[in-house]
Amino acid sequence: SGASSYGKLPCVYNGIVKRTVLDEIYSRTGTFFPGPSPDMANAIALSLVVKKHCFLDYPVSWAGACVKSGGGMGAMHKHALPIEDASWLPAGCAENWETVLPHFWTAATVWAESAMKALRRMDREDLLRSKFCVESVYGRFLVYSFSDRQRIRSLLKNASLPKVAKAYISAWFSRFMAFWKNLTLTTIGRAGSFRMIKDINDVVECEKYIHNNYPIKIEKWT
């Protein structure tokens, strides 16, 4: 998928990971986060080490975002700029950027870059050749960064255009579904399994509401 999301990958970001597992990643790469986006890079690396992991259908943590975070910038459509101007990225990131990716910082490109770097540093370049779909990155880039489309024009010459078109259509569909969910949430207060709860002002009130209305019950842990 071109690292378009975490999917069901194990994650230290909003997750709990055994220290010995993290140490194995460190011993193989010299870091716990072998890529410019720590969350995606660590998730990819963990997926190559972890033998078993599980998901709890209950929030044990809350993802934070502010106007200056990547998520906040994305919500304001300010999540695109030249790599050289992304001052928070690790030193040398621009010089070592993958040549098959647009030399531009967006959610699509930095996650793909992080996944590719993690696979390389974990000595799994075979997965880059057999599994990684760079056309998925191009398709999403055309949807979310259309005004900068000239940045991938040369890359499209060596790409599978049917795969790019498929990713492009899929990204538009996902964008429409997200818009529809937000619209129904704000108008009728629900969208599928999602509910909008009003008059909650901070994370403490949120935790109390969830604890009182959806108490966790774990009868057996294996």
Model regions and ranges:
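Conserved glycosyltransferase catalytic-site signature
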Residues: 14, 35-44
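Secondary-structure boundary/capping signal
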Residues: 30, 54, 123-126
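A structural signal for well-ordered alpha-helical segments within the folded catalytic domains
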Residues: 20, 41-44, 109-113
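C-terminal subregions of glycosyltransferases and related glycan-biosynthesis enzymes
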Residues: 59-222
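Residue-level marker of positions within ordered structural domains that often coincide
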Residues: 27, 51, 120
